[in-house]
UniProtKB/Swiss-Prot annotation:
Coiled coil: none annotated. Keywords: Ribonucleoprotein, Ribosomal protein. This is Small ribosomal subunit protein uS2. PANTHER family: 30S RIBOSOMAL PROTEIN S2 PROKARYOTIC AND ORGANELLAR, SMALL RIBOSOMAL SUBUNIT PROTEIN US2M. One of its GO terms (cellular component) is cytosolic small ribosomal subunit. Residues 1-83 are annotated as: Disordered. Residues 1-22, 42-57, 65-78 have a biased composition (Acidic residues). The lineage of its organism: Bacteria, Pseudomonadati, Rhodothermota, Rhodothermia, Rhodothermales.
Length: 320
């Protein structure tokens, strides 16, 4: 089925990669702040066909489910409330899309209007779809499954790393290595090589090497750590993947699709929502927008993990 903007005032987004389905023109238009009011007033409902089936099975050949968790009914509170308000989305600049000349036609149903050659995203749909993505992330965590966080664009790196580590999930933020999931065993060999160099350093083996050879080993380790350090503890394929920018991380999207791994992703107006299980139509370039979406998903993961811990404690008490 998947650069740089200011943090405070949402602006027209720089393109990381050209969209294959749309013509390209230079980004030279400033966003009109009146788009905020227009996006806030919309009463469009999220199309039912975009909402993923909550009861759909999680993709198989990844983390093993220990059978601890059974499907649960959504609470009435979850059904009637939203994790993020329209005002919060507006403040984060989540409604600002790209230049109309750079859009992907498949995003048309998520676009509220056009203003000054900029597409404005329908935040009513963004709000609902973010809720659905968060509930999916919560379910994965509650069942003891791993979600790989992926965001290699500069403004996403620190945010993705911080939140992934906060909830104990693997992450890739330096660059996406082709075959990270489809050639996972080779990736694991590289991780074992990194760990081998670390052992050599601890036991003094590196000190016995010639200075030049030792330096080469240390540089090799540094490179491996930068690229693979975030997934060193990921012993199996993830059960799901969260992607910040499907346009940039197109290889990750392709690999997940090939393996049947569910995708949760931020999709901007230049992106392709096709084959994304849980698309979140939002600005994927603004720091504030990336932070809002990623922190919301992280909170959901932590809720799932907490419910899992509580359930295990209840079982222990019942067995005592």
């Amino acid at each position: 089925m998947a650069d740089e903007t200011t943090t405070d005032t949402p602006d027209v987004q720089d393109e990381d990669a050209p969209d294959e389905d749309a013509p390209q023109t230079p980004d030279d238009t400033a966003s009109d702040s009146t788009g905020e009011a227009a996006a806030a007033d919309t009463d469009a409902d999220a199309p039912d066909e975009n909402a993923p089936d909550e009861d759909a099975p999680d993709a198989a050949p990844q983390d093993k489910d220990d059978g601890d968790d059974a499907p649960e009914e959504s609470s009435s509170e979850e059904e009637t409330s939203h994790r993020v308000t329209i005002e919060e989305l507006l403040k984060a600049g989540a409604h600002f899309g790209h230049l109309t000349s750079r859009w992907n036609p498949r995003m048309e149903k998520y676009i509220f209007m056009e203003r000054n050659n900029i597409h404005i995203i329908d935040l009513m749909q963004s709000q609902v779809l973010l809720d659905e993505a968060a509930e999916a992330a919560k379910r994965f965590a509650r069942r003891g499954k791993k979600i790989l966080f992926a965001g290699t664009k500069k403004q996403a790196e620190d945010i993705v790393r911080e939140h992934a580590e906060e909830c104990g999930m693997p992450h890739m933020v330096d660059r996406w290595l082709g075959g990270t999931m489809t050639n996972f065993q080779t990736i694991r060999k590289s991780i074992r090589r990194m760990e081998e160099i670390e052992r050599m350093d601890r036991d003094g083996t590196l000190d016995k090497l010639k200075k030049k050879e030792k330096l080469m080993r240390l540089r090799e380790h540094e490179k491996l750590e930068e690229t693979l350090g975030g997934i060193r503890d990921m012993a199996n394929l993830p059960s799901a993947i969260y992607i910040v920018d499907v346009q940039r991380e197109d290889i990750a999207v392709s690999e997940a699709n090939n393996l049947g791994i569910p995708i949760i992703a931020m999709v901007d107006t230049n992106g392709n929502p096709k084959n994304i299980d849980y698309p979140i139509p939002v600005n994927d370039d603004a720091l504030s927008s990336i932070e809002l979406v990623t922190s919301t998903l992280t909170d959901a993961v932590q809720e799932g993990l907490q419910e899992r811990r509580m359930k295990k404690e209840e079982k222990k008490k019942a067995a005592a």
